Amino acid sequence: MSEEYAVLSELPVTCSQIDNCAFSFWYEKFKKHVPKSRVIKPLPEQFIQYLEQDGIKLPMSSTELSTYTDDVARTEDNEYSDWEGDEDTATEYEPGIEPLNDFPELHNQIKEIIVELGPVTPKLNWSAPKDATWILPNNTTKCNEVNEIYLLLNASNYIVHDLNHAYDECIDKKEGFSTPEYELVLRQWFAINPALEFRVFVKDGKVAAVSQRDLNYYDYLDKLTDTFKDLIDEFVEDEMVPQFPDKSFVTDLYIPRPFNRVFLIDINPFSRKTDPLLFTWNEIININAQPDRDYELRLITENNIGRFASKEHSQNHVPKDVVDASLDPERIRELSQKWSELLLQQEKESSDEEK
């Protein structure tokens, strides 16, 4: 097969492949290798609408303490009072979906899981809101309270993809296709060393290639290559291939020190929609994966200073001033307040135009 043909060759993906990569499908199969998690399923329709609505509306309750609403809730003399006190605005402003009013059971269930597990990191069926870490002061997906979960999910383009575009490239998607049953996954938080996470491309039941997951340079990784490959081979061949229904898939594995076990972080479809990282899909498609063939574990070999200067995921999703503000908790708090002001101003102007 010529390289020109391979570049144009299709890599079809089916609806069942997407379904098989949903967290709840594979979690029970590999539970002992996955960080402790809780799955809430099904989700109320109001919660899905809440994630899809414009803006971010956090629950306002005098009985719930929150870093993100406490100042507003405990004082009547704040920036929002001018809008809230306007009679015209009060009668015509539609507040949208609000957690405490529209899905209180789910709200309380999330709070209970945080009490049980401690800090958590959220995701929907397939994606975690890693592109929205700029909105939290800690610049991670670590959530200590329910409002942080709402902020991450509402600000993430990855979550929008899960809700609206997960099956877009499926060759067997038919007219009248019904939406999947969405799920909220809350995984117990633990700090992952990004240098030790790897993306593994499994083709026809064999490891075809492995890429460093974090695209920064770590000088100690190269001498550990054989150790990583031995652990990856054993885990994929003994645990994943016998239990996962698709023989071609992409999985993210974490191998922490002292390098004696493997954590399963995620499973993705063997599809061009999955980021090949240090490879190209042309390379992967043309690899002839055989039992006796040694594959490449590809690493960053030199220090990419430009990569260190930017935050992963965020540079393509939010303005630079927002990313810069995320480095300062006070600035991001001010930004959130200004955002709310602008939304209220927009609602007021719309109401005035309709009169």
From Swiss-Prot:
Cell location: Cytoplasm
A single Gene Ontology molecular function, please?
A: protein folding chaperone
- Has UniProt tagged this entry with the keyword Lyase? no
Keywords per UniProt: Cell cycle, Cell division, Cytoplasm
Cell cycle listed as a keyword: yes
- Pfam families noted in UniProt: D123 (PF07065)
A Gene Ontology biological process annotation?
cell division
Q: According to its record, what are the GO cellular component terms?
A: cytoplasm
> InterPro entries under this entry?
CDC123
Just give the chief location class: cytoplasm
Similarity-based family: Belongs to the CDC123 family.
Role, per record:
Regulates the cell cycle in a nutrient dependent manner.
Please give the name of this protein.
Answer: Cell division cycle protein 123
Q: Which organism is it from?
A: Candida glabrata (strain ATCC 2001 / BCRC 20586 / JCM 3761 / NBRC 0622 / NRRL Y-65 / CBS 138)
